[in-house]
């Protein structure tokens, strides 16, 4: 998990099971021999990306994983016997799940390579309507030809998405911006596109502070050739803060960030980095200091997105699946599946939802999402 030419998938591929690549439509080239390993850069896009369609899934959903308990305290968060279910397939590469609404709400997620946002809602009993539908396409880059792709982009669509400002704030990595989407009209408004006169790399993930500030990460994973992309304007990958007036503050420029989260009381900021999961102190004004290692990379080997539950536990993608780490930094359990998991989201219906390569998974939990104003 070192620097150089490495893709977003490479961060979590090293320890994943070596399953054969799914066949994608002709426009979406696949890499032979299973998931890309460390040092791999995916081929440039040559056209719109389209995954092979899959039949819709209805309850009872197929079970594709299980829970491993590493500490007895895990039982307070999730039942070790709860199944890990596949609820939706047919993605090229799924990211950024976000729950909208209450118990009967719905899940939105980004298909980053296909440049669309997909909506999933639990089907009503007896329904034959497919529960997964395209909600917005293109979700990110449009381009002068309106085809929604470009050869200099690995992932033209949105990535991380959060509820904020009474709508949706997205890491619009295809456009290299942070943007707001109105949930009713689906109109997109750019909030920030760069810092000190230079464009962002490709914003990746975000988290909302209770005071309305938004912290986000800016690695180059959306660009072709990632760290070596000639389109990069910044010579660093930053952690930033988007202020309520849409001004931008640089938090850290010395790490290679990916996922990001805040403790329930907003006094701790967590960021995944190649060298491990970092934690910072956050003061009452939202200023950040005292970076230190929270979990070393050697403990879980690579990572991607993360979420903090209402009790302060971290649920983060890792080599094994979703590692569950308590506030003291101890890994107490793992959600394992038969393919990579990039990140997760807590639904108001009592489930944790997981983005896993070309599909969505879920598992019943005993914790919930942190409630914050505007979310």
Spans of features found by a protein language model:
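C-terminal segment of classical bacterial N-terminal signal peptides
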Residues: 21-23
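Initiator methionine at the very start of the polypeptide chain
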Residues: 1-2, 26
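Sequence-structural signature of mature extracellular/luminal beta-sheet repeat domains
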Residues: 26-375
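N-terminal secretory signal peptides and thylakoid transit peptides that target proteins
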Residues: 2-19
